[in-house]
Amino acid sequence: MTTEAKCPFLHPAGAGRALQEWWPERLNLHILRQNAPLSDPMGEAFDYAKAFNSLDLAAVKKDLEALMTDSQSWWPADFGHYGPLFVRMAWHAAGTYRIGDGRGGAGAGQQRFAPTNSWPDNVSLDKARRLIWPIKQKYGRKISWADLIVLTGNVALESMGFKTFGFGGGREDVYEPDESVYWGNEAEWLADKRYSGNRNLENPLAAVQMGLIYVNPEGPNGNPDPVAAAIDIRETFRRMAMNDEETVALIAGGHAFGKTHGAGPASHVGPEPEAAGLEEQGLGWRSSFGTGKGGDAIGSGLEVIWTTTPTKWSNDFFKHLFEYEWELTKSPAGAHQWKPKGNAGAGTVPDPADPSKRRSPSMLTTDLSLRFDSIYGKISRRYYDHPDELADAFARAWFKLTHRDMGPRARYLGPEVPKEELLWQDPIPPVDHPLIDAKDVAALKAKVQASGLTVPQLVSTAWASASTFRGSDKRGGANGARIRLAPQKDWDVNQPAELAKVLVKLESIQSEFNKAQSGGKKVSMADLIVLAGCAGVEQAAKSAGQDVTVPFSPGRMDTTQEKTDLDAMVVLEPIADGFRNYLQGKFSVRAEALLVDKAQLLKLTVPEMTALVGGLRVLGANFGNSQHGVFTKRPGTLTNDFFVNLLDMGTEWKPVSEEREVFEGSDRATGTPRWTGTRVDLVFGSNSELRAVAEVYGAADAQEKFVQDFVAAWSKVMNLDRFDLK
């Protein structure tokens, strides 16, 4: 017998063909199991906010500032200063954020993991993170990688003479890649199958090619056309929550520092970190060109230095952009870039590795877009003529870039949090009055239940308010009661006419209650909407024979229309909400996958998602009072009927059309129609994992457990944005 045959462990656990490879259309429920407590080495008891607040932030910044000019032989600093490298590190960590689903960004330290740690656009950032490891090691649990990466970018800017807008900590690390993020379906780096028609970029993507943070710096698909590149820039930055002025400020401000790297052909560069050998210890892109570092470094393939002072804040970027005329050239690696005509500016720019050498300024195709695009050009000229405006705009845009995915200001930690309230932070006033107590809660529930509002109305309104929350960028939720305001009050999914009726009655209850109070006690509409939903759930459970008390914590406040950014709020509108059996139109993605996507944004587990769908169906919370999935003869009553009837083998299901979006369930023996259901409904009987959970709730002894689990999941969603309770 051979040695190989004798060995009982020829293949490790988990090896072999993955289930998704056998069945590519299989519903991916893994994204509802990410970051489980068992995978977190810090343990459930760890309080990061408390740890961060005990940190001597000034000491950390002092250590970071010392690091800026402490060049290491294994990865020497360009121009003797690591500042530009660290600015790029923070920028590229935050720059993965996109408004479409709120995913990406710097909020969890994802740059440490695949795929972004190995994107072509992130070459050498593995070294940047390794350079700050001694500081992370020194301060340990008191500062997360996520916070340290952003803070390092801030200190880098400050060490180069730039005044930043501020810094808020509070980004808690995770310890695994975020597999919920759709980065595109391309199978090769820098491919761009994400476009259709006349360069229509697939939602929710922002970057133009697989493995890029933003746009191709050489121009669209490498075509060095600054005007065409401006179209890509505008669309990409818009999808990252930046307007034209912020976009110009970010590009110009960022390119006031440092350089790009293209000393030689990319053929000299080794595999990225995720593909590199064990001996590389998590580093990648080892280069065989010259020394492979310093002046010989290869990154993007472009070899551009924008200013005469690449480690000092200046307005040189715009000075060069406008004062020189530019002609196309190529980098040593063969990439398209631009140089001043007639060798203007020769000898005015320092060499990154040899102080005795001088170079000429250069520009990227996308830099020239800021001059030759008609809109960007006017903004750029104004910033050139008014450098103080540029400094303020860049400081604010940088703060927005690095904090956009952190949610409300209430989550910011530390002594450098700006006092100014910014519209993009979705501001909500602080509590300024005594809150309602248990006696008030009971009285208000009684008022709600006597108001004539139905269980479906109460439940649907509370769900519509709370379920806008996105765990990705911590936006949305019931706090603020923005469901009363544009644009939420007019969203199709919220059934505006029906919503208005509910809000009028709740506002009447609120007004009557508040007028009757002394000492300034009030109930906000934000609290009352949630409380009314809880009352509806309790009423529905009582109708099923169970007395339950749905947990309720007052403390939400009402915001105003003036404090609501209409453009920023639009992206929260659901195009699909499987919990309400709502689809805005036809999509290439299956409805059940959109349900799982929504559940992940709501931070739900598989059982929580299952309980909520089953409960909301029998409570009549469907959009447009649709009967799809209402598998009960007792609507408005909180029963496990959805699961009992879905799992009934006496029902035979058939699609009602070739689109296979809606199905009819008929008596298997007589053919008499019983129910109709959507893909979202039937997946709980079709998918093996979801069926296993549905069978728990469909059992003869499951009614009490189902109600308990539904109430727990409901309460979780109602409180997702209550960061003050966590």
Swiss-Prot record:
There is a cross-link at W91-Y214 (Tryptophyl-tyrosyl-methioninium (Trp-Tyr) (with M-240)). Pfam families: peroxidase. Gene3D superfamilies: 1.10.520.10, Peroxidase, domain 2. The record marks R88 as: Transition state stabilizer. Its EC number is 1.11.1.21. Residues 335-362 are annotated as: Disordered. Keywords: Heme, Hydrogen peroxide, Iron, Metal-binding, Oxidoreductase, Peroxidase, Plasmid. It is an enzyme of class 1 (oxidoreductase). GO terms for biological process: cellular response to hydrogen peroxide; hydrogen peroxide catabolic process. InterPro entries: Catalase_peroxidase, Haem_peroxidase, Haem_peroxidase_sf, Peroxidases_AS, Peroxidases_heam-ligand_BS. It catalyses: H2O2 + AH2 = A + 2 H2O; 2 H2O2 = O2 + 2 H2O. The active site is at H92. Its cofactor is heme b. GO terms for molecular function: catalase activity; heme binding; metal ion binding. There is a cross-link at Y214-M240 (Tryptophyl-tyrosyl-methioninium (Tyr-Met) (with W-91)). Binds 1 heme b (iron(II)-protoporphyrin IX) group per dimer. Formation of the three residue Trp-Tyr-Met cross-link is important for the catalase, but not the peroxidase activity of the enzyme. The keyword Oxidoreductase applies. Belongs to the peroxidase family. Peroxidase/catalase subfamily. Bifunctional enzyme with both catalase and broad-spectrum peroxidase activity. This is Catalase-peroxidase. It comes from Cupriavidus metallidurans (strain ATCC 43123 / DSM 2839 / NBRC 102507 / CH34) (Ralstonia metallidurans). The lineage of its organism: Bacteria, Pseudomonadati, Pseudomonadota, Betaproteobacteria, Burkholderiales. The gene is katG.
